[in-house]
């Protein structure tokens, strides 16, 4: 009988739902300099010259990453035939990966087709 009583009760969320009271697209006034006072010379000269909180190293790291990423071209990886033949002789390359399923071998003898040569 207790299950029938529980089924009839409305469900409530574990945490109270918080809804925004402002309409979408509303602008909130925020004065950055009043909230976070800092050196105006540092802001005007750029972050790269500002030495507070390690920002100089951070901005230099970003500039180096941008320079390294820009000249990189997306090229297809190409392997020579000789490299692939040498790679096939490595013992780890001959081992079947664990994630591949077991499929039975259909042919007992390989077909000798001249069309593949």
Swiss-Prot record:
GO terms for molecular function: eukaryotic initiation factor 4E binding. GO terms for biological process: negative regulation of translational initiation. One of its GO terms (cellular component) is cytoplasm. Residues 1-20 are annotated as: Disordered. This is Uncharacterized protein C8orf88. It comes from Homo sapiens.
């Amino acid at each position: 009988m207790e299950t029938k009583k529980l089924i009839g009760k409305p469900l409530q969320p574990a945490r109270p739902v918080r809804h925004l009271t402002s309409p979408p697209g509303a602008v909130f006034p925020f004065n950055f300099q009043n909230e976070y006072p800092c050196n105006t010379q540092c802001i005007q000269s750029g972050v790269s010259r500002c030495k507070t909180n390690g920002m100089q190293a951070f901005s230099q790291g970003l500039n180096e990453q941008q320079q390294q990423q820009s000249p990189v071209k997306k090229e297809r990886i190409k392997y020579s035939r000789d490299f692939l033949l040498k790679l096939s002789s490595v013992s780890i390359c001959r081992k079947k990966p664990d994630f591949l399923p077991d499929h039975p071998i259909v042919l007992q003898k390989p077909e000798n087709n001249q069309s593949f040569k």
